[in-house]
Amino acid sequence: MRLVLLGPPGAGKGTQAAILSEKLGIPHISTGDLFRANIGEGTPLGIEAKQYIDAGKLVPTDVTARMVASRLAESDAAEGFLLDGFPRTVEQADILANLLSEAGQTLDGVVNYQVSEDVVVERMLSRGRADDNEETIRTRLGVYRDETAPLIDHYGDKIINIEAEGEVEEINARTLKALGK
C-alpha cells in the first residue's frame, strides 16, 4: 500500500506509523527522519537542507522532494510506504503524483488523522518539550489548518478520515479497518 499520513502536530501520526509499518510490512518514511539522516551523513541534499535549517528557514520544496524521491526509489519502498510530512501543499502533492507516475505507481490513499485542538494541546503539553507552550501549539495548529485544508480538498475521495482520539490501540484498529486490513 502506498499511503500518505496527514494530521495536525500531536495527532499521533508517528506513533500510528510505527505500528502500521510493522503490521503492513512497509516502511514509514518521515521527512524529519530524512532530513536528520541526510544531514547526519553529510549528503549533498543534507548539506543544502542544513543551510536552510540553520538559518531558521523552511527547507524548499525542491530539496525535500529530491530527498523523498531518493527514498521512494529504495527497494524496501517498492511494494508500498507510509509517507509522513510530505506532501504538505497541493504543489507537493502534484510533485508526489508525478514521482509515482514515473515509477508506474499511484497513491492508494491518504489517511487523515482527525483530532480536536484541545486534545492536541493536552497531548503536546504532556510531552514536556521546552518549545511546547499552549500559544505556540495553537499557532502551529493554525498553520497546519491553513496549509492542509486545500490538500484535503485536492485528494478528495482518496481521503480516509480516522478519528484519532482515544487509546493508541483503538486508533490503530480504526485505521486498519478503514484500510481493509
Curated annotation (Swiss-Prot):
Q: What is the scientific name of the source organism?
A: Corynebacterium glutamicum (strain ATCC 13032 / DSM 20300 / JCM 1318 / BCRC 11384 / CCUG 27702 / LMG 3730 / NBRC 12168 / NCIMB 10025 / NRRL B-2784 / 534)
The cross-references to HAMAP family, in alphabetical order and at most eight, read: Adenylate_kinase_Adk
Q: Name one GO biological process term.
A: AMP salvage
Gene3D superfamilies recorded for this chain? Answer: P-loop containing nucleotide triphosphate hydrolases
One GO term describing the cellular component: cytoplasm
Instruction: From the UniProt entry, list the residue stretches annotated as the region LID.
Output: 126-132
Q: What is the name listed in the Swiss-Prot or TrEMBL entry for this protein? A: Adenylate kinase
Gene symbol of the encoding locus: adk
**Source organism phylogeny:** Bacteria, Bacillati, Actinomycetota, Actinomycetes, Mycobacteriales
Pathway linked to the protein: Purine metabolism; AMP biosynthesis via salvage pathway; AMP from ADP: step 1/1
